[in-house]
């Protein structure tokens, strides 16, 4: 599952745009002669925050195809045995998981990887890299596909969108509360004065800063959902196959990460980061060692 990219980057961009619109056209609805109307502000921020998150959710599948170069497999005309096997395996796993058959695709990447995305568990996309097809045996590949189907069946994208929407709302709310405080106490705005340019600049900057800091909450959920998807993969394809697939992926963690930054949240594996690396609090995936240890504790064949 590629680290928190496509969804979060799109969401952050929409959040900033929503914040600008809110600051320019919605100030009068929560700014009065006596200062901030916190009740109105919270409601407005909740609406704007959820809109940003839902836009990201509905765009996720389209963005995934564009950023990774995923080529969909025609379910009625697979071009070779590998494509035919992928379609059959995904169809079987989807049926067992109780979801509709997702779109299936292949994206060009030497790194072994895969992802699942989509706004609805019955309208999803599962894609694997060309490198994954070349280097994994069928049992391991089936486990990876089961892991991705697990993400879809668990409704991880919808849950992520709801969490991100709430986070967005509080980011926008506190950015404006802090911005108003600074505008009054640093720039000297009086109660009877409208917010000035300093207020708008401060809230825009705080939207970005608070958005990055608050992403730690979303990162925590991303790590949690990996354990759940691993469990789903183990139950659908076998625990040993899931462990074997993860250990094979571990050997590639020293390779440079070839996934677009926008898609890292949804990949099954992360390559080695180039340059500065954020603290574990901002990691979207548990380590392979942690994931394998959790699988060993799982009570399933």
Curated annotation (Swiss-Prot):
GO biological process: proteolysis
Xref: CDD domains: M48B_HtpX_like
TM stretches of this protein: 4-24, 38-58, 155-175, 200-220
InterPro entries xrefs: HtpX_protease, Pept_M48_protease_HtpX, Peptidase_M48
Entry's cofactor comment: Binds 1 zinc ion per subunit.
UniProt-annotated location(s): Cell inner membrane
Keywords for the protein's UniProt record, in alphabetical order: Cell inner membrane, Cell membrane, Hydrolase, Membrane, Metal-binding, Metalloprotease, Protease, Stress response, Transmembrane, Transmembrane helix, Zinc
Predominant location: membrane
E.C. no: 3.4.24.-
Top-rank EC class of the record's enzyme: hydrolase
Molecular function terms, GO-annotated: metalloendopeptidase activity; zinc ion binding
Binding-site residues for Zn(2+), renumbered to this chain: 147, 151, 226
One Pfam assignment: Peptidase_M48
Membrane topology: Multi-pass membrane protein
Record's protein name: Protease HtpX
Gene: htpX
